[in-house]
Amino acid sequence: MEQKYYHMNIVGCERDLPLCPLNEHLMIGAFVIFGDPELTTACAAELLRRVPAYDYIITAEAKGIPLAHEMARLAGNQRYLLARKGPKLYMRHILDVSVHSITTDREQHLYVDGEDAARMKGKRILIVDDVVSTGESLHALETLVNEAGGIICGRACILAEGEAANRSDLVYLEKLPLFDAAGNPLD
């Protein structure tokens, strides 16, 4: 079967997203910012213009990392926080929550180090990710922030996929449709 693509213009950057089957009836556009500094920087700069004031950014491992890093760098080398997919030996007093993502077929957990959790207490936290689809990963990050005593001041992503584009609490740059099995956008 020939690979199908979905063409997008994201803040002036033209990209062709390969379509990948999610199941026998549905495909998604694969959006990957790893290794794409032009797109990452352009998206980070535009999101910074649109998001509310915040004290810290938090993202989930792994695809949100380049975006959070670049947003923090552009905002003056601010510290950002990372929810890991697995606990690390150096992490102490870990907070963790479970998450189900559209791109994984099993339950996952997100973990935040106790020091980062302490940083969030009473602070305005901006949750950032590359793509929001079902909102499950976003919900897991919200739970971590709330358990740490942080104040969620906003949620931002590059692409809002499917129904996520209808969320009133989400700042995003572009809509990404879901696709039928033939690769046609479902709008």
Describe each model-derived feature in a short phrase.
Residues 67-75, 141-142:
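Short Gly/Thr/Asp-enriched flexible loops that form oxyanion-binding sites at enzyme active sites
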